[in-house]
Amino acid sequence: MGEGGYQQINKTLNACAFDDYLATQHARLPPLPDVEQISPRVVRVLGQNAGKFTLQGTNTYIVGTGSRRLIIDTAQGYRAWADLIESTLAQRSIRLSHVFLTHWHGDHTKGVPDLIRMDPDLAEGIYKNSPDHGQRPIEDGQVFRVEGATLRAVHAPGHSHDHMCFVLEEENALFTGDNVLGHGTSAVEDLGLYMTTLRKLQAQECAVGYPAHGAVIPNLPGKITNELAQKTRREKQCLVALDRIRNDQGRLASLTVSELIDVVHGTQLDEQVRKMALEPFMDEVLRKLAEDGHVAFRVRKGVKTWFALNTVRS
């Protein structure tokens, strides 16, 4: 799937997976320092782009213990972040050797020109899966080393087609990117692929997560288990709603995405939340359920409606 993929949900960054996530955006998030040494090998620098969908801002991570270190993600291109990075590197007598981009979204990639401005040699050290012109590729299982840190790349699509996570071997920690957040849950391009990725991340058996947004995840296995359970629960809610309408109105009864949202989430919804978040996500849930053989759709007079193929078992 290309960057046009399922799209508006990720292109605008005005997206979220479902109402659990929406509630988190409005909750009081714990403050995070602009710069913090979160482990002996990792310094976190906030992207200075806090917002409804970026939480406290994009986390960028300087990794290693020597004078040459690597950085994971580059935030959104705000001058305040560039100034923080420049001062942090200078104060610690650090020079960057590699720049790793977890995925293509602008709140992770737009700081690249600032890093190259600070050190033109970095133009040869920008790494990304499905790289843009002039960038170097990252492959699943590829290993990178700097003094004090060994990173192993893990291809982790679902939130985006090119998403990479990184295992920090010395700490049994995982840089989770946008696949697992410090608070709430992530938007996805492909729900089925995303759930497969979560199980792949589980198999890495990392204890701690360093997310691209939000606080450190101290119990990463528990967080991933909860993510899988939440998404499975959403699938079940959709199936139950479609099964109920079939039982009430007959075998051919079906619902549009908007009607299904009314049944599952109620009608008192903010219109932006409905259009930018719930409708794209509900459509993705239905796509996965169709791939799994549980639902199907028909199109009549240009209107797509969905119906259950099997009775839901409790």
From Swiss-Prot:
Q: Which reaction does it catalyse?
A: atrochrysone carboxyl-[ACP] + H2O = atrochrysone carboxylate + holo-[ACP] + H(+)
Q: What class of enzyme is it?
A: hydrolase
Disulfide bonds, paired cysteine numbers: none
Gene Ontology MF annotations = hydrolase activity; metal ion binding
Cofactor binding, per record: Binds 2 Zn(2+) ions per subunit.
Alphabetically, which GO biological process terms does the record hold? secondary metabolite biosynthetic process
InterPro entries linked to this entry: LACTB2-like_MBL-fold (IPR047921), Metallo-B-lactamas (IPR001279), RibonucZ/Hydroxyglut_hydro (IPR036866), Sec-metab_biosynth-thioest (IPR050662), WH-like_DNA-bd_sf (IPR036388)
Keywords on record: Hydrolase, Metal-binding, Zinc
Q: What is its EC number?
A: 3.1.2.-
The entry's protein name is Atrochrysone carboxyl ACP thioesterase AgnL7
- The source organism is Paecilomyces divaricatus
Q: What is the lineage of its organism?
A: Eukaryota, Fungi, Dikarya, Ascomycota, Pezizomycotina
The gene designation is AgnL7
